[in-house]
Amino acid sequence: MVRKPGKMYRNLAKKAYTRRKYMGGVPGSKIVQFEMGNLSQEFPVEISLEVLESCQIRHTALEAARIAINRKMMDQVGRANFHFKIRTYPHHVLRENKQATGAGADRVSEGMRMAFGKAVGTAARVQPKQKVFTVYTNEQYIEKSKDALRHGGYKLPSPARLVIERVPVDNTQ
């Protein structure tokens, strides 16, 4: 079956469907890592990508954005000069009532009978001004980090903006 376009799952139409205990066969999340880069060092600058509208972000879109941001950061900044973190998790299970197409589909298809649907993926439900991705880095890499996060934001279904904050670093060690 063909995967449906992401715009079909973008809106928060119903309440969250997360109880996997009662579901059979929920596909696993495609997100491989939630933290990348230099995890041991503390950085003075925090740059976050926050969404401007409430929406559902599919796990495939989160993974695509993660790959885009991480690759750009590795090329332009280097692994030792940043800490990249995904701040949301795709808990919401997406369902789809599969429809048969082609010759003889009318004999095979059930139509709207038992139309609850099967689990086809997961999504993160986000609210306005919620941070989705965060990069911690040094002062000299702010512009390159902003560029990387902007590229990752193009993969999300909601418009997004960048928020830059200074973090006090503890140097007493």
Curated annotation (Swiss-Prot):
Is 4Fe-4S there in the keyword field? no
Tell me the superkingdom of the source.
Answer: Archaea
Q: Which residues form the signal peptide?
A: none
Report the record's Gene Ontology biological process terms.
translation
**GO MF, one example:** structural constituent of ribosome
Cellular component (GO) terms are: ribonucleoprotein complex; ribosome
Keywords, ordered alphabetically: Ribonucleoprotein, Ribosomal protein
Any Pfam family from its record, for instance, is: Ribosomal_L16
InterPro entries in the cross-refs: Ribosomal_uL16, Ribosomal_uL16_arc, Ribosomal_uL16_CS_euk_arc, Ribosomal_uL16_dom, Ribosomal_uL16_euk_arch, Ribosomal_uL16_sf
Q: Which family does it belong to?
A: Belongs to the universal ribosomal protein uL16 family.
Q: What name has this protein been given in UniProt?
A: Large ribosomal subunit protein uL16
